[in-house]
Amino acid sequence: QELRKWMQTYPAVKTVPEAYLALAQFLQYQNNQVERLRIVREGIAGYPRYEGINQLKNIEKEILNASLSLEIATAYPGEQQSVKVNYKNLTGITLQLYKVNLPVTSAVLQNRTTHFESKYARLQREEHFSLKPTTDYLNVDTTLTIQAPQAGIYFLKAVPDGKKGVSDGTLMNVTALKTIYRPLPDGTLELVVVDAVSGQPDSEAEVTIYTEKGGGYSPQQTYQADKQGTLKLDFLNSNKYWYNAHTAADNAMPILNLWKNDYYYKESKRKEVLQLFTDRSIYRPGQTVYVSGLAYELEKESTRVLADKKYTVSL
């Protein structure tokens, strides 16, 4: 308040424009972009010959600029999928879904360049979404819903209405596979490949071990799951895994890393683990939610299923 009063009382003082900058910074800390915009515009109009006028103009541009970012988790084929959107100064976007023509091991996926989708993907479909205007010039989060395509690697791109230079995109892995692991007394690792929604084991799945190479991944060894979707892995003289599960029809599971220390317990401490599964990823009002689970206990030298263990599941 004192700074504002001083600016109004002594408008002819040469240092007043500096006060506008200081006040704009203070309003930034308060996250009051509406008043901040008013102040910098007042300074620009009142002191057009100020040598630091571009600083005020840059603040005005920063406030008015649009911003956009996407975030999406691994999707399940054919299911409704949530897309997290963070944006500012936009009223609508078009989500474009591209099918990527690269294997999951490709270095290009990890180091995407400008116009990635035009070089390595083909447009499958697009859908427009309206966004609530951000009249306070602040970034907001919202969640949109799309239907996931069939298993594969995709690129999801958001193109703003009437705005250029602020589009954003992210990889979207669509797979029905998920892995659960547990350590065994002999130092190996047991993996179970299951359906990510139902939790049912996948006996047709394989797990491949990779090493990093040139920004991508080079396959080293592949293991076949048994009828229970289970297989055992050795660490191959390494303390770290890069691996993924795949089938003939589903080879889009992201390549994951797992350090040996993530599950190796130096002390004999028990750890209870619970994995929950539902029959679908998104529900409509009134639908029944079917839940199944796998509960087991980890110890340094043993792993055992917790039979008849009771849990309370809350929605």
Descriptions of predicted regions:
Residues 1-315:
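N-terminal, cleavable Sec-dependent signal peptides of secreted/periplasmic/extracellular proteins
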